[in-house]
Regions:
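Positively charged n-region of N-terminal signal peptides that target proteins for export
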Residues: 1-5
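Hydrophobic h-region of N-terminal signal peptides that target proteins for export
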Residues: 11-19
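Outer-membrane beta-barrel porins/channels
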Residues: 21-34, 77-86, 93-410
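Transmembrane beta-strand segments of Gram-negative outer membrane beta-barrel proteins
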Residues: 23-39, 57-74
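Asp/Glu-centered strand-loop micro-motifs enriched in Gly/Pro and often flanked by an aromatic residue
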Residues: 38-40, 45, 84-89
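Outer-membrane beta-barrel pore proteins
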Residues: 40-42, 49-62, 101-107
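Active-site/binding-pocket entry motifs
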Residues: 41, 70-72, 121, 378
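Generic detector of contiguous secondary-structure segments
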Residues: 47-56, 352-359
């Protein structure tokens, strides 16, 4: 049991990072968020640095775009097969942000430059200390930040390309109970904390076919997040300290490549529709390895098979200009899970998701635009088994994410 519990702790780390960076919540731009998370074909503002670097040189002027969001997730658990035991994750709010600055070097320039600093995901989950799955997880906290300097070149009025270098860094903190008790009856605990970093790139092509039709193609590379000196801390009875020494660990956690294609169509002077399709190369995430600086009979280097499968997400959105100052937006998305049966666990349980979004943009002045958006994520209830611990349950996950931001044109 003790060996399996430690294995589950390590496995949970991989679940955290895969959920954090690869699970396509698409919070990197508020206008795009409001339209189902798509933005490959239409460079709405400076956040095209993330969605399609090729659109940067097509912006009319230099822009600054900043936004803050508030993720409020909830997970419901029912134990299988009877469902007699249920639990809910504790209420929490997480605060990802995005900042972009960029545009053409000068009016009429073919070259565009920009910088994006964005959080592809920052969230977590906390269960009650005495819940039935405490030997798998008690709490999770994840923060991640990507920094992307970007350059774009506009060949003509129809075709532009762009490329960005990505430096990614983040932190994680995971705690769980251990099935060991001291003389007072208090259970032991384990905590894994670490900082990770990695590098990648973002490529994009923007095609302005005519006054009504636009296309976009992007490729974001795989990023290997490397933890070189994570901390593993154990609280156990004194007699067992030699079996559970506080130590360091290293690992490499791959975040998958994403290829996207998008189309935008201006139906009339007021209405624009857009469609995005995202291919996520999860199959590259086939295994995970942990190396510890100290080893005991209970603490050894481990290698985990993952068996993720590739997914294709679809995003549909609309922008309607009520007048010159006010725009309304809405969208839908379907985002399937890459996690195979036998690997569904309460760290961050994963299932196919349906997404509804909406938003409003108000042009306060000719230069300043205020944007508010919201996303509701509803996951299909999933019966899952975590084979490592033979832990079974039905999971139902929802999340509400409002956000507010500003865009300023120079």
């Amino acid at each position: 049991m003790m060996k399996k519990t430690l294995l589950s702790l390590l496995f949970a780390v991989s679940c955290i990072w895969s959920y954090g960076a690869g699970y396509q919540l698409n919070l990197q731009g508020l206008r795009q968020l409001a339209m189902g998370g798509g933005g490959t074909a239409v460079p709405w503002d400076a956040s095209t640095i993330f969605y399609n670097p090729g659109g940067l040189s097509s912006l009319g002027s230099w822009q600054i775009n900043a936004s803050a969001l508030f993720i409020m997730p909830n997970v419901e658990y029912a134990q299988l097969p009877t469902g007699s035991y249920t639990a809910n994750s504790n209420a929490q709010t997480f605060y990802p942000f995005n900042f972009y600055a960029g545009g053409p070097l000068k009016k009429g320039s073919k070259w565009g430059l920009g910088l994006g600093v964005y959080t592809p995901f920052g969230s977590g989950l906390k269960w009650d200390d005495n819940w039935t799955g405490r030997f798998l997880v008690r709490s999770i906290n994840l923060q991640s930040i990507f920094v992307q300097p970007t350059v774009s070149y506009k060949f003509n009025d129809h075709i532009s390309v762009g490329a960005g270098y990505i430096y990614a860094f983040g932190s994680l903190d995971l705690t769980q109970a251990l099935p060991l008790q001291d003389l007072t009856g208090a259970e032991g605990s384990a905590e894994l904390k670490g900082n990770a970093s990695g590098m990648g790139f973002n490529l994009g092509v923007h095609i302005n076919a005519n006054d009504k039709l636009q296309f976009g193609f992007t490729y974001r590379s795989r990023v290997d997040m490397k933890i070189s000196s994570g901390n593993a801390t154990f609280v156990v009875p004194t007699s067992l300290l030699s079996n559970f020494p506080n130590t360091n660990f290293s690992s490499k956690l791959p975040l998958p490549e994403v290829a996207s294609v998008g189309v935008g169509y201006k139906v009339n002077e007021k209405l624009t529709l857009q469609l995005d399709v995202n291919f996520v190369g999860w199959s590259a995430y086939d295994s995970l390895k942990f190396d510890f600086t100290q080893h005991t009979s209970n603490l050894k280097d481990e290698h985990f098979p993952r068996f993720y499968h590739n997914t294709v997400a679809v995003r549909l959105g609309a922008n309607y200009d009520v007048n010159k100052k006010l725009s309304l937006m809405g969208g839908l998305a379907y985002d399937p899970s890459p996690v195979s049966d036998g690997y569904v666990s309460p760290e961050l349980p994963d299932a196919d998701r349906y997404v509804i979004t909406c938003g409003i943009a108000y042009r306060a002045t000719s230069k300043l635009c205020i944007i508010a958006a919201a996303e509701f994520v509803n996951s299909i209830a999933r019966d899952g088994t975590y084979d490592v611990m033979n832990f079974k349950g039905t999971y139902k996950t929802t999340a509400f994410t409002p956000g507010i931001g500003l865009s300023y044109n120079f």
